[in-house]
Amino acid sequence: MSALSLLILGLLTAVPPASCQQGLGNLQPWMQGLIAVAVFLVLVAIAFAVNHFWCQEEPEPAHMILTVGNKADGVLVGTDGRYSSMAASFRSSEHENAYENVPEEEGKVRSTPM
């Protein structure tokens, strides 16, 4: 069996390479650029798809939303009778339906001329 293997190996090393193993030459520079851009766009699309499915924000659980009265009460527009935890930080202590404007530090506020 080993003699047969050595004979086949010897024949394969003696045979010249096939013509299809020789390259035809480099691609044109514009074709290389086009292929590089296409590969880059495919990789970016894959990254966006992975980011979309991997980093999805889970919906807020229902037990964290507290109902405080009916819609006729003075709650934030769009909350439909649900208490918003964001509103607690700027509610006014003077009136239950009033909100205070919280002053921002000068460095955090960005303004652009109109």
Curated annotation (Swiss-Prot):
Topological category with respect to the lipid bilayer: Single-pass membrane protein
InterPro entries, per the entry: PDZK1IP1/SMIM24
Biased composition (Basic and acidic residues): 105-114
UniProt subcellular location: Apical cell membrane
Cytoplasmic face of the membrane: 52-114
Keyword terms, alphabetized: Cell membrane, Membrane, Phosphoprotein, Transmembrane, Transmembrane helix
Residue intervals passing through the bilayer: 29-51
Family: Belongs to the PDZK1-interacting protein 1/SMIM24 family.
Name this protein carries in UniProt: PDZK1-interacting protein 1
Organism this protein belongs to: Homo sapiens
